[in-house]
Amino acid sequence: MHLYNYDPAPNPQRLVYFMKLKGLELPTTQIDLGALEQLKPEYQAINASGTVPCLVIDSGEQLTEVIAICQYLELLHPDTPLMGATALEKAQVLEWDHKIFTTLLSAVADMLRNGNPAFEGRALPGPLNLAQIPALVERGQVRIQHCWDVLNTALEGKDFLVGNSVTLADIDLYVAMNFAGWVRERVPETASNLLAFRDRVKALLD
């Protein structure tokens, strides 16, 4: 197997932390997003979507979404389960993963890609050139503040989102919280459950 990634970026970080907790190392090529290497013909010949991560398995087939790569690695290496230990926990991890990705992560991405001049004409990842929509920046701020409230409530009396140990859901939330800093959004001091969660997960991941 061979992994194409860009470790500093939020989406690839989800996989980096997952592999770290699993104790897995894969041959990896870094695709520099800052230099737009993901849009070069050499990489698009590997992954036409022009995104990272991309895992090329031994058969030559590719997995290009974090959730799919994590599921594949989890099935190959079931020790230290990070996607739930029971049927219910597995479903809950997927549910939280989807919620975090479609709410907090996407809200931050909307703010970044629609408000930062570096993404002018590239408001979405990949090869499709789309104009920025400034109104999505303001909407993203509102969505993020709502997410803090929802997530802080969800963590009341809990160390982790699912079960009694860290899972992919916690990794995703931790990455999303840090990603929010890229658009100068911070967890409010009143969200004590979220702040404690961040410290708890940071001690495990960093």
Each language-model region and where it sits:
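GST-like domain detector, emphasizing the conserved glutathione-binding G-site
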Residues: M1-P134
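Short, cationic motifs built from Arg/Lys/His that form the positively charged side of catalytic pockets
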Residues: R14-V16, R200, L204-L205
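Aromatic-glycine hotspot motif
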Residues: L55, I67, V142-C147, D206
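GST-like fold's C-terminal all-alpha helical module
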Residues: T103-K202
